[in-house]
Amino acid sequence: AHHGIRDSSTSRGLGDVYERQLQLQLECGGNGRSEFVPAASGNQWTTGAIGCPKFTGVRLRDVLNYCGVARDAVYVGYYGADTHTSGNPDADPISRGVPISKAMERESIIAWAMNGEDIPLQNGFPLRLVCSGWPGSVSGKWLNRLVVRNQVHDGEKMAAPSYSVPQTHVAPGSRVPNEDMKVIESMPVKSIVTFPRSGINQDYRQRMPVRGHAWAGDDQISGVFLSIDFGATWLPTAVGSAANRLSWQSFESWVQFPEPGYYEIWARAMDNLGRSQPMVVPGWNPRGYLNNACHR
């Protein structure tokens, strides 16, 4: 099933294709997992498992096309130099991937630099795959081998329940059979307020500047709105352009508190397809994926 490349013995240097620089979002599929009730299994991320650095590398499609991809290719899988997180040398480390259509996007790259410097070891040095807009687990780190498949890749963590959610909505706490799960692809619309920080005291007579970022998986942001009255009313913000497709977009505005008291600033983003963040944690699932509730 590894017969997607016409000449599997081909060896190429990355200098044979053009270097690219792209600012690309990487978000853990379980970003916001800690907010699910009952608790979902996995690292209890709050809302900070997202970044959007500038990567330097080459387009994955340029490498694949240079090697020659067979017509029956449907999936690209990766293998890294890491070992299983348990430390067991006999256990296979994560080996995920993306459909050939995602691999061939202009923004899918093999990167060796991040923010103008060699990628740090914990971020995948010396090479990592970056397939932005999908769960970060598809962007393999410590990359040492790619396989082009004529079937869906079957590496470690490709099968349910890993990086999968129920095909239909289920009641919180339900047991969901693996055959009733579907793999996560594009991540949902989401936002994060980066200023002000929580817990500050503010003179209510002064305007409070508000800044943050918004992103929408494979799609674009059409607007970001703020509320200081628990979602009763919403104020528009100024949303900047994306540095390139699949980069997050920054927003800024200000709020004026009407009187002294306790306030929360909520942010709610909308994408170009009209989908917006829910005000409560959506779609409970056993592994706690895809929480895109309003940031507050």
Describe these PLM feature segments.
Residues 48-62:
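Mid-length scaffold segments of soluble, non-membrane domains
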Residues 19-23, 65-296:
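Extended, aromatic/histidine-rich regions of cofactor-dependent oxidoreductases associated
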Residues 11-14, 31, 194, 260:
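Intrinsically disordered, low-complexity serine/threonine-rich segments
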Residues 37, 60, 75-77:
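Metal/cofactor- and membrane transport-associated sequence elements
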Residues 1-18:
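Short, small-residue-biased leader/transition segments that mark boundaries at the very start
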Residues 19-49:
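Short, conserved helix/loop micro-motifs enriched in His/Cys and acidic residues
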